[in-house]
Design a protein with these regions (language model features):
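Conserved ABC ATPase signature
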Residues: 165-169, 173
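Helix-to-loop junction immediately C-terminal to a conserved catalytic motif
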Residues: 76
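The feature captures the beta-strand-to-loop junction immediately N-terminal to the Walker
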Residues: 61-63
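H-loop/switch region of ABC-family ATPase nucleotide-binding domains
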Residues: 225-226
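Catalytic Walker B motif of ABC-type/P-loop ATPase nucleotide-binding domains
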Residues: 190-193
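Conserved ABC ATPase "signature" region
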Residues: 143-161
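Conserved ABC transporter NBD signature motif
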Residues: 84-96, 107
């Protein structure tokens, strides 16, 4: 199965291009400005600024505890910054924004988040129900809903598990179901926390090939990983966050394993 304009998951190139209009100065899709976040009195994210443009594939690397997962939760709206600001497609994402039910629903349709631990987001009785849940909330015609679910399950090779319980699957199968469930909503950006963790080589190849095709179709990907070889394989722009919460951009091979990235 291939992803193309108007094919497979109905890639919406107008949506992928943003909402600012042709010829206008296009804001970054994701922008963090001096963001601070603390948990239980401990500063987890300390003055982080970064941006992700439309059509980019960006990888966050860094040691455990540097704040990668928290940054992704902030970007998905699961956490709110204590200080600084977060802009999505030029709009400030804060408590007031997320209390607007229409804006929040559209935001969560456009930002697809896959947890590192797939158990955190699987909750339906069967794989088919899991993959259908998100797009079923979007008011799609029945035939379009069925097509999205079928295509997403085939894409991540879980179609034969349609009636299986997600809770009885292997870790790698759960990861692929979680990816299918998010991708079936056709988000503008995929935010993926360690997307290849727990996957065997064949499953990893499925994910890598999908991500390359998704970006080629005009979509955006932000992922965290510890693996430099994966970043090189994807040709991703690398953003490193060190143990002191400093943000550094550098070619992957020049940033040593002592900073927390591994081969």
């Amino acid at each position: 199965m291939e992803i193309g304009k108007g094919d497979v998951l109905t890639i919406d190139m107008n949506s992928a291009a943003g909402t600012n209009g042709a010829g206008a100065d296009v804001a970054p899709l994701i922008e963090l400005r001096d963001v601070v976040f603390s948990y239980a009195g401990h500063t987890v994210v300390d003055g982080v600024s970064l941006q992700v443009d439309r059509g980019e594939l960006v990888a966050l690397l860094g040691p455990n505890g540097c704040g990668k997962t928290t940054i992704m939760r902030l970007i998905n709206g699961l956490e709110l910054a204590d200080a600084g600001s977060y802009l999505f497609d030029g709009h400030v994402v804060d408590a007031a924004f997320l209390k607007n039910s229409v804006a929040a629903q559209r935001f969560h349709q456009r930002v697809g988040f896959v947890f590192q631990n797939s158990d955190a987001q699987l909750f339906c009785a069967t794989v088919g129900e899991e993959v259908a849940f998100g797009p079923a909330q979007m008011g799609l015609p029945a035939d379009e809903l069925d097509r999205r679910v079928r295509d997403a399950m085939e894409l991540f090779q879980v179609a034969d598990l349609v009636d299986a319980s997600p809770y009885q699957l292997s870790g790698g199968q759960k990861k692929r179901v979680a990816l299918a469930a998010v991708v079936s909503m056709n988000p503008d950006i995929l935010v993926l926390d360690e997307p290849t963790n727990g996957l065997d080589e064949d499953s990893c190849d499925i994910v890598v090939n999908f991500l390359l095709a998704y970006v080629a179709a005009g979509k955006t990907v932000l992922m965290s990983t510890h693996h430099q070889d994966l970043v090189r394989r994807l040709g991703a722009r690398a953003i490193y966050i060190d143990r002191y919460h400093h943000v550094v951009e550098a070619p992957v091979p020049s940033y040593g394993t002592e900073n927390g990235a591994t081969d």
